[in-house]
Swiss-Prot record:
Protein family: Belongs to the calycin superfamily. Fatty-acid binding protein (FABP) family.
Name listed for the protein in its UniProt record: Fatty acid-binding protein homolog 8
Single Gene Ontology MF annotation: fatty acid binding
Expression sites by tissue: Intestine.
Organism, as annotated: Caenorhabditis elegans
Keyword Cell inner membrane: no
Its biological purpose: Lysosomal lipid chaperone which binds to a wide range of unsaturated fatty acids, including high affinity binding to oleic acid and oleoylethanolamide, to transport them into the nucleus. As part of a lysosome-to-nucleus retrograde lipid signaling pathway, translocates into the nucleus where it activates the transcription of genes promoting longevity and activation of mitochondrial beta oxidation.
Gene Ontology BP term (one): long-chain fatty acid transport
Chief location category: other
Subunit-level organization: Monomer.
Subcellular location: Lysosome; Nucleus
Length: 137
């Protein structure tokens, strides 16, 4: 079983599938979708006490997320949409449930896990699934 602390570190995106399609599914505009799809962000994961930090850095936009496991919070996404979010850790995976606050927004589920020394993520909204692969820096 993977320890939560094994996620800590800096991870560089090396492969992405369906990211632009995922952004389209959740209603992100064309120009932002194109710009975001061309970046290769670094994901920095830290633990401070019982607060996790998933900070994403890129030439396009930086996004910082701080949360406690199993504690609901309001998340402001990079496109300024607000979500009620709950993150759990189950079977070696961080699972983030992003529930829409406004009716015209879309809910998503993000899953993050480690496999063969890589950090893998899926983003799912509706029937669209994005897959991302990171390697440790």
């Amino acid at each position: 079983m993977v320890s939560m602390k094994e996620f800590i570190g800096r991870w560089k995106l090396v492969h992405s599938e369906n990211f632009e399609e995922y952004l389209k599914e959740i209603g992100v505009g064309l120009l932002i979708r194109k710009a975001a799809s061309l970046t290769s962000p670094t994901l920095e994961i830290k633990l401070d006490g019982d607060t996790w930090h998933f900070n994403q850095y890129s030439t396009f936009k930086n996004n910082k997320l701080a949360f406690k496991i199993r504690e609901k919070f309001v998340e402001i996404a990079p496109d300024e949409r607000s979500y009620n979010t709950l993150v759990t850790f189950e079977n070696g995976k961080f699972i983030s449930h992003q529930d829409k606050i406004k009716e015209n927004h879309h809910s998503s589920v993000f899953t993050t896990w480690l496999e063969n020394g890589k950090l893998l993520q899926t983003y799912q909204s509706g029937s669209v699934i994005c897959r991302r692969e990171f390697v440790k820096e």
